[in-house]
From Swiss-Prot:
A GO BP annotation: coenzyme A biosynthetic process
Feature type site, description Transition state stabilizer: H17
UniProt keywords, alphabetically: ATP-binding, Coenzyme A biosynthesis, Cytoplasm, Magnesium, Nucleotide-binding, Nucleotidyltransferase, Transferase
Catalytic activity reported: (R)-4'-phosphopantetheine + ATP + H(+) = 3'-dephospho-CoA + diphosphate
Keyword Metal-binding: no
Catalytic EC class: transferase
Protein name per Swiss-Prot or TrEMBL: Phosphopantetheine adenylyltransferase
Organism: Haemophilus influenzae (strain ATCC 51907 / DSM 11121 / KW20 / Rd)
Residue positions binding substrate: T9, K41, L73, R87
Record's GO cellular component terms: cytoplasm
SUPFAM superfamilies: Nucleotidylyl transferase
Main location: cytoplasm
Amino acid sequence: MTSVIYPGTFDPITNGHLDIIERSAVIFPRVLVAVANSPSKKPLFSLEERVELVRQSVVHLSNVEVFGFSDLLANVIKQHNISAIIRGVRTTTDFEYELQLAALNRLLTKGVDSLFFPPAEKWAFVSSTIVREIYLHGGDVAELVPVPVFNALKAR
């Protein structure tokens, strides 16, 4: 069975992330969403909270699995017998950075390629960073994030 992985910090997961997961789930029989610990980024939500928010956001997708990780992505890829890495790219800056990571991951995994998904037009400007900034300044992010994330932000 072809398995792909969509790694990220997902702090928080946005509707742009969810769109990429849904599109991947149509194409591939098994999609693993790997939520990175990333303590250096000083996340708004803990790893456990982010994993749970992603799980709640993809509950309608039967072929999607969600887990957290702190290891090197290449090691996670080997452990789960992954065929490809899914990455979202919004801008040329994203693409240049992701191209470098793709080459590095291909080297470290002995040939696992990265597949780049452009965003749906309505999510092209959305990022977790932008969502956090809007939220921290009292703005409304209801249209930018899945309902479980919006509810978690309201509860903070």
